[in-house]
């Protein structure tokens, strides 16, 4: 069984490509079924395992399979599922086998692979991915163990290093950008579209600047109202967005929509109604909520999640000592996991040996019972039984020694000598 991680992230692909391979939450379970099916068949020795992690910054497929062509099969599946030409997708995809897959999972959960170094949101996102895969029946021994250790390593890294200290979050970066456009956020009206965790973080940071007005527009009215009331704001229906957009100086959007909810025409009308006063817009969604053409309008300052990443990275350099500590912890834990994985690889062999030995035992016991039933001497039957079992049990090792090449025979002799030295002990 081999572990494999296939994916793209903010290091390897722009948001324009990442949004095309994102998985909406409701699509993940059925996607897992079709993903696993590429390895199901008469040649599969064990059931494949899979999990899908899809966030603003990454789409990753975690797999455990005995298919030697797993890498190519997984990339081709991702291409077909999202109707993307393989030539367009493949250059941006990373494929990480075995220890590389383990190391990657540990680094992702610890915040070392995030756009915001040390951010904690990814842990919750990974736990959601694991929960969804478990509910879909897609997890097994290997991925369960991988993710259990992943979360333990993330906890160890965050509790023993300063990896998350003084980090600049995406929400804080959005405020900094707004302050470059407007002298004071306190003089501006702010609209948040969505009511998820990222919008909640952004609302917290913007509310600290005491804007003139804070408004939340959300598809679910109750959730939008609840979030707005936390910050002494108000909520409006999402359906009113086109007619109310011109009222706001700052617009931050992050929904789970698979299609843009703010089009070029709506923003053009808003700019005209505002008499060309600037609008600062932040699109943190993947797939994007705001049509990218909006950024070409003269009076609109549109930033995506990738744009904010440049500001976030400014604060990453000061925490390189913590990164080195975290990497050392992760490397040790990777070696520990690989030792467990190596031990697991022996289990099928041991199970097969037990099965074969039991088949031989049953056959010889059945033969001995027939001999006893016809009146043969019990002592002679026991002697025949023991000789038959001895001959059959040593037939395999003897045959292997006889067939071994000269360069392998010495190694086999040494291994078997040590084996029979221990297994032949009569100590009680």
UniProtKB/Swiss-Prot annotation:
SUPFAM superfamilies: Glutamyl tRNA-reductase catalytic, N-terminal domain (SSF69742), Glutamyl tRNA-reductase dimerization domain (SSF69075), NAD(P)-binding Rossmann-fold domains (SSF51735)
Alphabetized GO MF terms: glutamyl-tRNA reductase activity; NADP binding
Biological pathway: Porphyrin-containing compound metabolism; protoporphyrin-IX biosynthesis; 5-aminolevulinate from L-glutamyl-tRNA(Glu): step 1/2
Binding site for substrate: 55-58, 114, 119-121, 125
Stated family: Belongs to the glutamyl-tRNA reductase family.
Subunit text: Homodimer.
Name of the gene encoding the protein in the UniProt record: hemA
Site (Important for activity): 104
InterPro entries membership: 4pyrrol_synth_GluRdtase, 4pyrrol_synth_GluRdtase_dimer, 4pyrrol_synth_GluRdtase_N, GluRdtase_CS, GluRdtase_dimer_dom_sf, GluRdtase_N_sf, NAD(P)-bd_dom_sf, Shikm_DH/Glu-tRNA_Rdtase
Broad enzyme group: oxidoreductase
Protein's recorded name: Glutamyl-tRNA reductase
EC nos: 1.2.1.70
Keyword Membrane: no
UniProtKB keywords: NADP, Oxidoreductase, Porphyrin biosynthesis
A Pfam family annotated for this UniProt entry: GlutR_dimer
TM ranges: none
Domain notes: Possesses an unusual extended V-shaped dimeric structure with each monomer consisting of three distinct domains arranged along a curved 'spinal' alpha-helix. The N-terminal catalytic domain specifically recognizes the glutamate moiety of the substrate. The second domain is the NADPH-binding domain, and the third C-terminal domain is responsible for dimerization.
UniProt binding sites for NADP(+): 194-199
Protein role: Catalyzes the NADPH-dependent reduction of glutamyl-tRNA(Glu) to glutamate 1-semialdehyde (GSA).
Misc. remarks from the entry: During catalysis, the active site Cys acts as a nucleophile attacking the alpha-carbonyl group of tRNA-bound glutamate with the formation of a thioester intermediate between enzyme and glutamate, and the concomitant release of tRNA(Glu). The thioester intermediate is finally reduced by direct hydride transfer from NADPH, to form the product GSA.
Catalytically driven reaction(s): (S)-4-amino-5-oxopentanoate + tRNA(Glu) + NADP(+) = L-glutamyl-tRNA(Glu) + NADPH + H(+)
Biological process (GO), any one: protoporphyrinogen IX biosynthetic process from glutamate
Positions of the catalytic residues: 56 (nucleophile)
């Amino acid at each position: 069984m081999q572990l494999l991680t296939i994916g793209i992230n903010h290091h390897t692909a722009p948001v324009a490509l990442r949004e095309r391979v994102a998985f909406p939450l409701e699509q993940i379970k059925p996607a897992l079924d079709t993903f696993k099916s590429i390895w199901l068949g008469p040649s599969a020795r064990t059931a494949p395992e899979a999990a899908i992690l899809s966030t603003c910054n990454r789409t990753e497929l975690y797999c455990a399979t005995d298919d030697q062509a797993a890498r190519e099969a997984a990339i081709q599946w991702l291409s077909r599922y999202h109707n993307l030409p393989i030539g367009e997708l493949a250059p941006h995809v990373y494929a990480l086998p075995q220890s590389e897959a383990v190391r990657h999972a540990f680094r992702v959960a610890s915040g070392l692979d995030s756009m915001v170094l040390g951010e904690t949101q990814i842990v919750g996102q990974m736990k959601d991915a694991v929960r969804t895969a478990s509910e879909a029946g897609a997890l097994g021994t290997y991925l369960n163990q991988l993710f259990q250790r992943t979360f333990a390593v993330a906890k160890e890294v965050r509790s023993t290093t300063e990896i998350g200290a003084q980090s600049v979050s995406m929400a804080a970066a959005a405020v900094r950008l707004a302050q470059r456009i407007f002298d004071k956020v306190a003089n501006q009206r702010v609209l948040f579209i969505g009511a998820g965790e990222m919008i909640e973080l952004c609302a917290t940071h913007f509310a600290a600047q005491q804007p003139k007005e804070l408004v939340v527009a959300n598809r679910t009215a109750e959730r939008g109202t609840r979030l707005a009331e936390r910050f002494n704001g108000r909520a409006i229906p999402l359906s009113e967005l086109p007619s109310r957009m011109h009222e706001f100086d700052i617009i931050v959007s992050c929904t789970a929509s698979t299609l843009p909810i703010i089009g070029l025409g709506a923003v053009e009308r808003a700019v005209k109604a505002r008499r060309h006063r600037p609008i600062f817009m932040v699109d943190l969604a993947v797939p994007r909520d705001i049509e990218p053409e909006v950024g070409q309008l003269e009076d609109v300052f549109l930033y995506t999640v990738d744009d904010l990443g440049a500001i976030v990275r400014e604060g990453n350099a000061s925490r390189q000592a913590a990164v080195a500590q975290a990497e050392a912890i992760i490397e040790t834990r990777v070696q520990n996991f690989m030792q467990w994985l190596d031990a697991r690889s022996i289990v099928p062999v041991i199970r097969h040996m037990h099965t074969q030995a039991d088949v031989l035992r049953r056959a010889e016991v059945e033969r001995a019972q027939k001999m006893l039933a016809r009146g043969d001497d019990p002592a002679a039957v026991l002697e025949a039984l023991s000789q038959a079992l001895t001959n059959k049990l040593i037939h395999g090792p003897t045959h292997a020694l006889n067939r071994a090449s000269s360069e392998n025979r010495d190694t086999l002799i040494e291994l078997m000598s040590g084996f029979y030295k221990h297994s032949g002990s009569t100590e009680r």
